[in-house]
C-alpha cells in the first residue's frame, strides 16, 4: 500500500479531522513561503532589516513607510485564488468529517474555497482597522488608501492590518479554540508548515487522537511522532485523494 492509499484509509476511518496548515498550503496559489529557500526570508532587501524585523511591531511604529512598503509588496496578494489543497479541504468539510482548519496564514483562500470553520492564528489581511476611530477597511479599500502610509479617511489616523506582527501576542481566544478542536480530533493532518513558528506550533501538543499525519516539502520536528509522513506539495497530495 502506498502512502496516498494509507492517507485515504486513515481519512475514511476518521470522524473528527482537523487540518493544521502553514505557508506551504498557499504556495501553489503563488504566495511565497516565508521559510523556503526561495521565500521572503531569503530576499535581498538592500538594507539592514531582516524580513522578521520589517513585519514587527517596532517597525510598524518607528518606520511605518518601510513597514507598509514591505507588507503590501510581499504579504498581500489580492489576486490569489484557492488551489487544490483549499478545494479539497472545503469538500472534506462538506462531508462532516473535517471539523476545523487551523491556519497560520493571513490570506482568505480557505474561505474563498468554501470552508466555514477556519481559525486564523495570525489574523487576516482582509481585516484592517483605524487605530483612532476603529473604522473597518476590507483589503480592497485598504489598498486604495493613497500614500506610503494608509491613513483613515474619517479621522486621519493610521490604518493597521488585523494581523499578528512579530513582538505581538496571538489572539488568545482563537488560540484556545484551536487548542480545543485539536484536542478533540481523532486525526490531525499537518500540512505546509515547518512547525518552527511559536507559539502556533505548540498547538500540536494538544493532540491526543489516533492518527497524526504530516505532509510537507521538507522535514518537520513532528515527523518522528507521526503515523504517516508524506514529502511533497500538499495540493498535489490532496489531488490524488478521493474527492
Give the location of each predicted region.
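Conserved catalytic core of sirtuin-type NAD+-dependent deacylases
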Residues: 1-243
Amino acid at each position: 500500500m502506498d502512502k496516498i492509499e494509507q492517507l485515504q484509509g486513515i481519512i475514511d476511518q476518521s470522524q473528527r479531522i482537523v487540518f493544521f496548515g502553514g505557508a506551504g498550503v498557499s504556495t501553489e496559489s503563488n504566495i511565497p513561503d516565508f521559510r523556503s529557500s526561495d521565500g521572503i526570508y531569503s530576499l535581498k532587501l538592500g538594507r539592514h532589516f531582516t524580513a522578521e524585523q520589517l513585519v514587527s511591531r517596532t517597525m510598524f511604529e518607528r518606520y511605518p513607510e518601510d513597514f507598509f512598503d514591505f507588507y503590501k509588496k510581499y504579504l498581500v496578494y489580492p489576486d490569489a485564488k484557492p488551489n487544490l489543497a483549499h478545494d479539497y479541504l472545503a469538500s472534506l468539510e462538506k462531508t462532516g468529517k473535517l471539523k476545523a482548519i487551523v491556519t497560520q496564514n493571513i490570506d482568505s483562500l480557505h474561505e474563498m474555497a468554501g470552508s466555514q470553520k477556519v481559525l486564523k492564528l495570525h489574523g487576516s489581511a482582509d481585516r484592517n482597522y483605524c487605530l483612532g476611530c476603529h473604522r473597518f477597511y476590507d483589503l480592497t479599500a485598504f489598498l486604495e488608501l493613497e500614500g506610503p502610509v494608509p491613513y483613515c479617511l474619517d479621522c486621519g489616523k493610521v490604518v493597521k492590518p488585523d494581523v499578528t506582527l512579530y513582538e505581538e501576542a496571538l489572539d488568545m481566544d482563537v488560540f484556545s479554540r484551536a487548542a480545543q478542536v485539536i484536542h478533540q480530533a481523532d486525526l490531525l493532518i499537518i500540512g505546509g508548515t515547518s512547525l518552527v513558528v511559536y507559539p502556533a506550533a505548540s498547538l500540536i501538543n494538544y493532540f491526543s487522537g489516533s492518527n497524526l499525519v504530516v505532509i510537507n516539502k521538507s522535514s518537520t520536528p513532528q515527523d518522528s511522532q507521526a503515523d504517516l509522513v508524506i514529502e511533497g506539495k500538499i495540493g498535489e497530495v490532496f489531488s490524488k485523494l478521493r474527492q
